[in-house]
Amino acid sequence: MRKLFDESGSYLPAFLYIELDQSIDFQNFENHPDEVKGTFIHEYCHFIQDVSTTYGYSNFVCYMQDFLYKIREDKNSCDRDILDYNRDFNDFYNGDTEIKEEPFFISEIEIVKDELVEDLYPGSNVDKVVVKYNKKHEEEYKKFQFGSRCIAESMAYLVEKRLYKVQERNYEFPYNVCEEICKHEYAAFAKNDIWIMALCELSLLEWDAGPFFINALHLMKEKEFIPTTVRDIELFIDEYFKIGFRGDKNVIESILSEVYPKCNIDFSPIKKWIVTRYELGCEFREISKCFISMSLCSEDIQARYDLWNIIIKELGCPVLVDSEGNWTEGANLDNIEIDLAYMLAPMAIDKLLNHKGEFIPGPCPLKSICQSADDPSYSEECLVDPRKNTNINGLCPVKGFWRMYRLK
C-alpha cells in the first residue's frame, strides 16, 4: 500500500486515513502555524480526490480488492490474475512516485506507447508520458513517468498554498511537476496557479490522467486559449473532451460488505457514510467538474475560507491521527454523529499482511493510538506481535477483526 505523503503528513488511499507528524487541535485550528494548517489541508485534499475523482475510485477498487484477497481463506489463481491486472494498470496510470535526483529541471516531454504493458497485456494500446530531466549531454538524462500521482500531489500543494502561507517549493518532485510541465509546454497558461490547479482537477477525472493533462495543455496552446476564469477552462475541456467522475456504487457497496461483514457489531453506519461520501463527490462534480478550484478562485481570502469550510462541512472528516497518537474524526449522517473507529482495524490489518496474506512480524500500526488513549486492551505484545495480545481488560479492534476474518 502506497501512501500519499510529504514531510509532515500522509494520506492512505482507499482506507480514508490521514496521519499528521504534528500535534493538532481542531478546537483551536486557526491558532496553529500556517505550515500545520497547510499540511492538514494538503492531506484533506487527497481525501476529496479519493471520493470525487476517477483516480480516487480506481485506487479504492484496486487497494480494497488487494486487501480482500489478503484476508480470504480461499485464494485462487483466477482472483490473483484479476488483481494483478487491475494493480498493474492502476500503478501504470499513477506513474512514478519518486525520482533519483532533485531538484529537477525538465528537458523534454513526450507521449509514447508503453511496450512493457503491451507485452504483458497484448492489445492494451496505452500511452504514457515520459518526462526527461536534468539533461547533461545529448543522450545523458534522467526520466520519470508522469501520471495521476504527480497530478494529485501537485494539485494538493497548490490548494494548501492558496489557503495558507506555506513554505514555497521549487523544482521539487512531485509537488512542482505540473507547474513545471505547464511552464515548459505552454508558458502563458502557467502564469496562474488556479488554472494549473483546475487542469489537475479535471485530469483526475480520467483513467489515464497523465496523457490527458498533456494533450489538453497542447490543445490549449494550439487554440491559443487563455482563460479568464476557472469556468472557462471547464467549458473548454467539455467542448473537446468527454470527461467525468467514473465509478460504480454497486462495486463500492459490494467491496464494503466484505470488509465489514455482518456480525454482532452494526457496521452499516460506517458503510453508509463511506458510500455517501462518493455520492456527495458525484453531486459536487455535477455542480462543477472542478469544484475544488472553483471554491478557491476568488481573490478574497475570506471567500476562499468560507467555501472551503462548506466543502469540509458537507464531506466531513475521515479518521485523522496526529503525532501524539490523538485521533479525530468528523462524520455524521442525517445530523447523527457516526463513530468511525472500526475503520482503523482493516487499515491496520492491511499493513500487517504481505501480498499473500501472510503476517509480517512487527508492532501493531495502532500502538500509538492505544498508548495515547490509555486503552485497556493495550499490552506489550502489541509492540512485537499483536496477534498474541492476551490482555482481557478491553476489546482490541484489530484482534476482533483478525478473528472475524479468520486469519492465522
Predicted regions: what they are:
Residues I111-L120, E139-S148, Y157, R169-N170:
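Cation-handling catalytic/transport regions enriched in His/Asp/Glu
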Residues E30-D34, D50-F92, N134-E138:
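Post-HEXXH active-site segment of zinc metalloproteases
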Residues Y17-I18, L120-K136:
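Active-site-adjacent bridging/hinge elements
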Residues M1-Y55, M64-Q65, R169, F173-K408:
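Non-catalytic terminal regions of proteins
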Residues N31, E35, K143-C150:
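Short, solvent-exposed segments of well-ordered alpha helices
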